Amino acid sequence: NVGGSQKARHLFSILLLLRSQELLGVRSRNERAPLAIASCGNAALAAATLALAADWPIDVYVPIWMSDGFGDVLDRLGARIHRCERRGDDPPGDPAMLRFREAVDRGAIPFTVQGPENALCLDGGRTIGWELAEQMAWSDARRVGRVYVQVGGGAFAGCLGAGLADSAGSSAPALVAVQTEGCAPFERAVRALDERGVTDDDERASRWGDVMYPWSDPSSLADGILDDETYDWILVDRAIRRTGGEALVVPERTVVEAHGHAVEAGFTASPTGTAGLAGLVHDLAVGRVDRDARVAVVMSGVAR
C-alpha cells in the first residue's frame, strides 16, 4: 500500500477519475486546480505521494500540533502545508477540516478520505474488504467470526464492512469498530440511537445532527484516529448492524498494551494501526471472545 496504510486505496479512485477526464479532454491538464486534503497522518502522506507521482499540486491542511518531522516528509513530497489555528468565529469542529472546505469552495479538488466530502473515495476503499473476503473463502479453516478495525473518520471501517458484505453476503463476519476512550464519537452516536430505540437505517441517518457532533479534546496514543467526528459514521453503523457487529471503546492502557504485543510479534505498525488489535485484547480480557476463536484484525498504518 502506497504510503504505508490503506489510505491510498481511497484516494486512487479519485485520481483515476481525474486522469481519465484529462485523457478524454473533459479536464485540461494545463489548468489543474490544486488537490486539497485535511490530515496530518497517513491520509496526508498517501495524498502527497500520489500527487507527486501525478505531478499534481496539493494543499494539505493540518492542525497546529502536527510534528515538524512529519511536516518535513510532506515538504519532501512537494505538498504545500497549511497549519490551521482555530479562529474566533470558527464553528465547532476541526479547524483543518474547516479550512479544507473553504479551499474546496474556492475551487480546489477534494482529494480526501471522507465520503461526505468526495464519495469516490469509498469505491477504492472497498477493495480491502473484497481481498479479505477472498482470503477467507480460500481458507479451509473455521469461518472468521469477528473482524476488528480501527475507526477515526470512518471510511476505512465502513468500506471494509461494505466490501466484506459485497463478497460474503450473509456469511460476512461481525464487524467490530474500535475507538479509544479519548475519542469515541462513533460509539457515542450509536449508543444514543440504540438507547432511543431507533432501528430504521434511514431514520438513524436522519438523526445526524443530534448524535454526531465534535468530540471535545480528543487524545490518545493512537493519534491517527483522533477525528473529532466520524464523518462516514452512517456507513460504519450500517455495516455493524448488517453483520451483527458493534461499536467498541477501549481504555487507553489497552491501546498501549496492544501496540506492545504487535511490536513483540514483529509488526511495524503504529499505535493507530494496532488500535483494532486493542479491541481484540479488550474482548479477550473481558471474556467476550474465546481464546480459540477465529478472528481477523486489520492493522493499517506503519510506525514512523
Label the predicted regions.
Residues 78, 86, 90-113, 166-269:
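Active-site/ligand-binding loops adjacent to catalytic centers
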Residues 192, 277-304:
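Catalytic phosphate/nucleotide-handling subdomain of diverse soluble enzymes
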Residues 98-169, 256-262:
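Active-site/ligand-binding-proximal alpha/beta "capping" segment
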Residues 1-28:
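Positively charged, low-complexity intrinsically disordered leader regions
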Residues 16-23, 45-57, 162-168, 278-288:
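Alpha-helix C-terminal capping segments
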Residues 29-34, 43-101, 187-191:
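Active-site-proximal loop->helix
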Residues 8-14, 37-53, 68-71, 122, ...:
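Short glycine/serine/threonine-rich phosphate/pyrophosphate-binding segments
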Residues 24-50, 54-65, 143-156, 175, ...:
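A short, small-residue-rich loop immediately preceding and capping a beta-strand
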